[in-house]
């Protein structure tokens, strides 16, 4: 949080100075660990047994929110049976974190209510990233730390405008404003005067699967180095090799472009374009270009509009970001 999200990191430090308890889970001795009540340093790749061991402790010591579980949680008995195998002692063997330290963290999270969790790319950009987040959700459900002030599972996105991009609908399952395709279709069709797809598109992992099976033929990567960033490098590279055509649009000749790209489109930096950013707390900040784009580079929106018009697309006659 302190390295990639300095504002949130500062808020966390301020909360600790005002009496909040802090658990840090990171193999490294990061700056935020200096403020931690408990610092767990698991062996890389062992997030799941560690978090499940915390859940085991909360269930075993009956630190869970009984009323919340009874009213809001399903599959309680199967979960209790499942979690029995993840004792702190068994996790100690995998994670290289002492069982007592795991118990201390679990007790602290369960009793210092309200509690919230923050996780970054160390959890999500992982071969078991989805399962890791599910473990965090389980901890929140066990303790009733969802849906109330000071609670929740808070993902810290990788770059400064991922939140804004998602909110604008850069996700196969949602429309602008983070409205689902099914719920928002009637309203958006009436406002846009155009049809909205009945079926959502593929997410990145589904695209990789579709590429490997030959269902996906081409890919356009904008500001994202797929080859270097995706968790399963071997499978990702195999999928990229299976594609017939790859466009890479970025500031730099990244690994995806260098190894697999068919066409490279140079994009302008954030210092060379107008626009907005939305941070993690959904605060919108306007950005003004400090200089003109260098060389042949252009702002992303302009490249997209020019290609769309060349393909005969309608609705791409924008002249500046404000008009968009």
Q: Where would I find each of the regions flagged by the language model?
A:
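Long, His/Glu/Asp-enriched segments that create or flank divalent metal/ion-associated functional microenvironments
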Residues: 170
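A contiguous, basic/glycine-rich beta-loop/short-helix subdomain that forms a polymer-engagement track
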Residues: 141, 166-167
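Cofactor-pocket helix-loop regions in the catalytic cores of large enzyme subunits
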Residues: 1-161, 175, 184-324
């Amino acid at each position: 949080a302190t390295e990639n999200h300095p504002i949130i990191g500062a808020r966390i430090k301020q909360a600790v100075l005002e009496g909040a308890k802090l658990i840090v889970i990171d193999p490294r001795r990061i700056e935020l660990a200096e403020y931690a009540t408990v610092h767990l340093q698991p062996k890389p790749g062992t997030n799941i047994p560690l978090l499940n061991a915390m859940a085991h402790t909360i269930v075993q010591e009956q630190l869970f929110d009984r009323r919340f579980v009874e009213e809001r949680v399903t599959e309680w008995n199967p979960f209790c049976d499942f979690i029995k195998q993840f004792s702190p002692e068994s996790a100690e063997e995998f994670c290289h974190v002492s069982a007592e330290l795991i118990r201390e963290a679990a007790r602290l999270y369960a009793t210092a209510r309200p509690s919230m969790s923050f996780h970054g790319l160390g959890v999500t950009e992982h071969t078991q990233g989805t399962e890791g987040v599910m473990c965090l959700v389980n901890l929140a459900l066990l303790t009733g730390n969802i849906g109330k002030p000071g609670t929740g599972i808070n993902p810290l996105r990788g770059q400064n405008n991922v939140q804004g991009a998602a909110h604008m609908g850069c996700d196969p399952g949602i429309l602008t404003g983070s409205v689902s395709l099914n719920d928002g279709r009637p309203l958006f069709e009436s406002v846009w005067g155009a049809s909205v797809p009945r079926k959502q598109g593929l997410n990145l992992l589904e695209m990789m699967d579709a590429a490997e099976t030959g269902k996906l033929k081409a890919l356009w990567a904008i500001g994202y180095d797929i080859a270097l960033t995706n968790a399963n490098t071997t499978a990702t590279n195999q999928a990229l090799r299976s594609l017939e055509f790859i466009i890479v649009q970025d500031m730099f000749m990244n690994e995806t472009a260098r190894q697999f790209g068919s066409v490279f489109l140079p994009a302008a930096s954030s210092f060379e374009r107008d626009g907005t950013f939305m941070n993690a707390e959904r605060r919108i900040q306007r950005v003004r270009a400090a200089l003109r784009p260098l060389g042949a580079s252009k702002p992303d929106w302009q490249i997209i509009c020019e290609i769309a018009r060349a393909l005969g697309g309608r609705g791409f006659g924008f002249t500046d970001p404000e008009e968009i």
